[in-house]
Amino acid sequence: MFNMNVDESASGALGSSAIPVHPTPASVRLFEILQGKYAYVQGQTIYANLRNPGVFSRQVFTHLFKRAISHCTYDDVLHDWNKFEACIQKRWPSDDSCASRFRESTFESWSTTMKLTVRDLLTTNIYRVLHSRSVLSYERYVDWICATGMVPAVKKPITQELHSKIKSLRDRCVCRELGHERTIRSIGTELYEATREIIESLNSTFIPQFTEVTIEYLPGSDEYVAYYCGRRIRLHVLFPPAIFAGTVTFDSPVQRLYQNIFMCYRTLEHAKICQLLNTAPLKAIVGHGGRDMYKDILAHLEQNSQRKDPKKELLNLLVKLSENKTISGVTDVVEEFITDASNNLVDRNRLFGQPGETAAQGLKKKVSNTVVKCLTDQINEQFDQINGLEKERELYLKKIRSMESQLQASLGPGGNNPAASAPAAVAAEAASVDILTGSTASAIEKLFNSPSASLGARVSGHNESILNSFVSQYIPPSREMTKDLTELWESELFNTFKLTPVVDNQGQRLYVRYSSDTISILLGPFTYLVAELSPVELVTDVYATLGIVEIIDELYRSSRLAIYIEDLGRKYCPASATGGDHGIRQAPSARGDAEPDHAKSKPARDPPPGAGS
């Protein structure tokens, strides 16, 4: 799964003292958490907003648009305007009665056409750049930052296919302008240069997957090194991890949430195990017993014996005696049997008038004595058997403890028993597992193996007994823990990256947006360290949430081109610009003509700085 092949020279440079940083079981789990493998909760959806490359796309768009539209001179704009005005004057003869309105409509038509042409040229070509595929992934950059605080980067050459695309982009930006105006040509040329730099930078740097990189720490030189496909690559350590006793602890949001995430995940796992165990059908062992054999005997006697069979009567007596657990019940059964049997006896004492007890009384006395003697013998026999079993139990317990001590000694540190290596590994894993974040099965095994745990019902002495026994159907609650984890995710991401929530009128959060601190913390290192886009200016938090159309309007309104056009409008149409009457003003090209008095009252504006440069 992981590409960890490092060449021989690199491995020699690392030495035996190198501490592995990634991939390790802990670091891989951090990336798996970001992918939603463990306890994905609602609060983690904010991370999807965090890794959205829309803010970086707006930054690139703002840079290209601002740089291109600002690369024009006052002389170019004036030349294009004079050229346009000359064409209009040839087609439309001048009329002094409507000269002011004519000038206003002419200049408004030219300025609007210029704005639309520039916007179409810029947006069409910038969109091609933004929506073309690049090898540099902003999403992977955010994954590395949130998981480890370090970002590996690989430099790669520009492909021939990309060179062809850049050449075709030059043809679209420079050679196909409408009218071949100077302003459009200058803007198109600068757009091509800026776009070429952006495309080459975004396609010459590659952020690999977390499964393709090996990162190690060299204590001797106090540096972190990264390897990709056997060769050393750049590694940007933005948030250095803490290393103590060979254990690496990253300074990242996911590392801080790790404990709580796995507590929630193991609770959900425990709840699922309990659900599966408690919903299983009850199981019972069915076998033949001697308790119900008397029913077959009674049925056989009922079919084959006479109506009054002594064997059946005696068997019924025994059955009724076995079903009664109290002395009064036994007495009633005996009384009933004697009453039935006395009716068939001939009482000689009563017949011949001899004194003494009657036959019924003698039978009753005989039967009672016999039954009591049988019960007494049975009870004594049960007590003797219980005493024997207790002695046997104590003997076997001593043997078991002796065997456990011998087994523990053989499985302890330094034991070389190959047959016991597998149980030793299992016992060691169960002993080292974290009860809160470890595997549920291993945690249960650890608890059962603990000498201080009393998880089973047992009777070890004469005075101990089981007070209660039951089957528990407990399922641990996970809803509250999931809710707490959601709030913890939100709090961690909001406070680490200084995100700003956007809510509706009811106070419900709709989405989150980048603040100025978020741009400095997250977007700044990506722009200047990873992508190496030094000419690009960081986008403001206002532009980070605006749509492309709103960004275009804002950038054009504050651009050099808009200022030049506005200045030309004030000089060419002073009445409409100042709000006064519609005076007639000559074009700027006719510099020797006199200006009207109301125009002289206000000093003419000097060309902005950089005009003609």
Swiss-Prot record:
Residues 592-605 have a biased composition (Basic and acidic residues). GO terms for cellular component: host cell nucleus; virion component. It comes from the Viruses. The keyword Nucleotide-binding does not apply. GO terms for biological process: chromosome organization. InterPro entries: Herpes_Portal (IPR002660). Keywords: Host nucleus, Viral genome packaging, Viral release from host cell, Virion. Forms a portal in the viral capsid through which viral DNA is translocated during DNA packaging. Assembles as a dodecamer at a single fivefold axe of the T=16 icosahedric capsid. Binds to the molecular motor that translocates the viral DNA, termed terminase. Homododecamerizes. Interacts with terminase subunits TRM1 and TRM3. Belongs to the herpesviridae portal protein family. This is Portal protein.
